[in-house]
Regions:
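Alpha-helical transmembrane segments in inner-membrane proteins
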Residues: 2-359
Length: 359
């Protein structure tokens, strides 16, 4: 707070415990976020060392920082398989955590996520159309054909949800129910694509529907990282506007927030993150539900902390799910989407029960 800001306070307010208390809250939130970030990095290291055969930390250190001293086979395993896999889990979790946090804010609904409201299912159907029938946007390069299709369908689904919220005035429960209807609709359409697909194409579609990290690569990581950093930067620039929106549309507009434009830009960011996540690893549910709620409990509603907190917790949760997927059945790598669903369904039900009076 500057001297000019303090001069605007009521006489004697600057000397009251309000400002020290505010600084104490900020420090506490910073410590919590640092602890979450540290836990996320530890989980990343554990994820890299886990696999069909254990990898000692000394061997991991040599593969990462002293390749000339380490084993060539371990170097290939770490850099070409395990590290991309673990980093993809981290990055996808962070992207879905951010998308879920923004969607819950702009729709003012605790159950709103790209997965529960059909955005991820729409993206999966768009990708399925591109894979099975080759239907997509003309002129798009082959490398971007599937992600572009996923993005278009995710955006259309998100815009449809926003239109229903604003133009029909349905309650929060109505938006959730409509989103569930979208989930079933697009899942049925994906099932039709699976039915008409040939054997080779069907394998790819099964990979999408289960949500798996096994096809992670450095190229996909690079694309997702660049997009995620750009989206996170734009979201943090809108943090105070999103915080104001949590107070209600009319209050936010009185603060000078252009609510309609804010919602549209947020939907674009949500659609982009959801589409890329689905395009690269398939639908992974409930990360966008779990991470924002934990962040809200730990860090509050201030989006300067709530958004990055959701990002960090999303990365941590999916990284832990990745570890569980590798170790739950000996010799088998369970698709991580199955693990997140098993964890997410009870969490979803607990949220429904907690908010049953307003849903």
């Amino acid at each position: 707070m500057t001297c000019q800001d303090k001069s605007l306070l009521a006489p004697g307010l600057a000397s009251t415990p309000v400002i020290p208390r505010y600084r104490q809250i900020i420090r506490k939130r910073a410590v919590l976020m640092s602890a979450i970030a540290l836990a996320m990095m530890v989980s990343l290291m554990v994820d890299v060392t886990c696999g069909s055969s254990g990898l000692p930390l000394s061997a991991l250190w040599q593969a990462l920082f002293q390749p000339e001293k380490g084993n060539a086979g371990i170097h290939v395993i770490v850099w070409d398989i395990r590290l991309p896999y673990a980093l993809m889990a981290l990055l996808v979790g962070m992207a879905l955590g951010l998308a879920g946090a923004e969607m819950q804010t702009i729709l003012n609904n605790p159950l709103a996520t790209p997965f529960t409201l059909g955005v991820s299912s729409a993206a999966a159907f768009g990708a399925a159309l591109a894979i099975v029938l080759g239907i997509g946007i003309p002129g798009i390069p082959a490398a971007w054909f599937i992600p572009a299709n996923a993005f278009i369908f995710a955006l259309l689904s998100a815009l449809l949800l926003d239109g229903i919220t604003r133009w029909t005035g349905v309650a929060a429960s109505g938006v959730v129910l409509f989103g569930i209807a979208l989930v079933f609709t697009f899942n049925a359409l994906v099932a039709i694509m699976q039915f008409v697909a040939d054997e080779d194409t069907l394998q790819g579609l099964v990979f999408w529907t289960m949500g798996s990290l096994v096809r992670a690569s450095w190229e996909k990581l690079g694309v997702l990282a660049v997009v995620f950093i750009a989206v996170l930067f734009c979201a943090l620039r809108s943090a105070w506007q999103l915080t104001a929106l949590r107070l209600g549309e009319e209050r936010a507009m009185s603060f000078g927030v252009h609510v309609r434009r804010l919602r549209l830009l947020s939907l674009l960011r949500i659609s982009l993150l959801s589409a890329l996540a689905v395009a690269f690893v398939g639908p992974i549910g409930f990360i966008g539900l779990v991470a924002p709620h934990i962040a809200r409990i730990l860090l509050g509603e201030d989006h300067r902390f709530y958004l990055p907190g959701s990002v960090l917790i999303g990365g941590l949760v999916l990284s832990l799910a990745s570890i569980a997927a590798k170790n739950s059945i000996p010799g088998v790598m369970v698709p991580v989407g199955i693990v997140t669903s098993l964890v997410g369904v009870p969490f979803f039900l607990s949220i429904v029960l907690r908010h049953r009076g307003s849903l």
